[in-house]
Amino acid sequence: MSRTKVLESLVDGRATREGTQQFRKRFANAQPDHFYRPLVDGAVVSSLGLGTYLGECDDAEDARYTATVIAALDKGVNILDTAINYRCQRSERAIGEALHTVISGGDIKREEVVVCTKGGYIPLERTPPATKEGYRGFLHSEYYGPGIMGPDDVVSGGHCLTPRYLDDQIERSKKNLGLASIDIYYLHNPEQQLDVLPRPEFLDVMRAAFTTLENQVRRGVIGNYGCATWNGFRVPPENRNHLNLEELLSVAREVGGEHHHFRVIQLPVNLAMTEAVRTPTQKIGSDRVPFLEAAHRLGVSVVGSATLVHSQLTRSLPEQLHSAFPGFSSDARRAIAFAQSLPIAAALVGMKSVPHLEENLECPKTS
């Protein structure tokens, strides 16, 4: 089946508690039991997730990602992370190609895989425009002209969270992924809006975005939603770009009631970026605690990103970390082991080669 037909025929269903538990049982002999962990909605995910951020915008890179996603699903990884802007939409499409292959072949059921994507940054189409004029022309033809968003909706040259824009991006992501429903949909670095907006106006933006996402949940288009951040939850309250989890949960309850679907946060946590573990950035009532403690208290799942910090943690780690993580033959696996030792659902690692996938999967087997 051609990729065009895949886009026209979306796979129904989404990840379920029962489906992901069945996936876990199927790999009982290949992965230790602690390799799988629950999200707050009961679905179970592998503690190593596959990320798709880096890479060239070309067909060869697409093929590498597709092959690695297929291999990951075959080896017990069932949480896939991407974003519509990654590699000019190619990362979503590579995942879609892989999912079509394994689902249509009967190797994997849709209900067994947790697929996550993000919206916020304006995605390009296959390759970046060659000039600034080309980019401006792209914005006008693709977004401004059709009325999906206007120039005043765009922050920092390429970030937007308006309701109509988010609705549009979700539909595009569905087609890219070949899926009728997305399991986790993140607002991508919402703290970017705080570069220009006062906090009260920012909360209005988040309120409107959460309302849009709750409506998408009711339609069955997404399962749960959250925020995928870089700085927001790691910086202190005094920082302009600070995000407070309790405050955002209050907004979610305001628009979605006590049974809202704001349930997952993604943020960097690794050997080099330990703020989520050590730095008390979050206020809960009169307490000030690190983010991971706040998430635990407030009942929000956490997915860790930048586990290897774009390969920076794959070499030259201090000798004391070798003794702290005995039995590991590489710094990459020590860094992954650190992330997997934390109270998070999954640690994301960008992987676009099967040998790297296989090396990284050795980590939980020897811990």
Name what the model sees in each region.
Residues S2-R37, R164, E171, H188-S367:
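Beta/alpha (TIM)-barrel catalytic core signal, keyed to glycine-rich beta->alpha loops juxtaposed to Asp/Glu
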Residues H159-S181:
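An active-site-proximal structural segment forming one wall of the substrate-binding cleft
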Residues G51-R64, P151-D167, V196-P200, Q320-S329:
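Active-site mouth loops of central-metabolism enzymes
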Residues R64-T68, D168-R172, R334:
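Well-ordered alpha-helical segments embedded in enzymatic catalytic cores
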Residues L50, L80, I95, V115, ...:
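Conserved, mostly hydrophobic/aromatic
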Residues M1-S141, P146-I148, R164, A180, ...:
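N-terminal binding-site loop/beta-alpha segment at the start of enzyme catalytic domains
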Residues G76, G178-L179, G223-G226:
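Alpha-helical hinge/cap motifs
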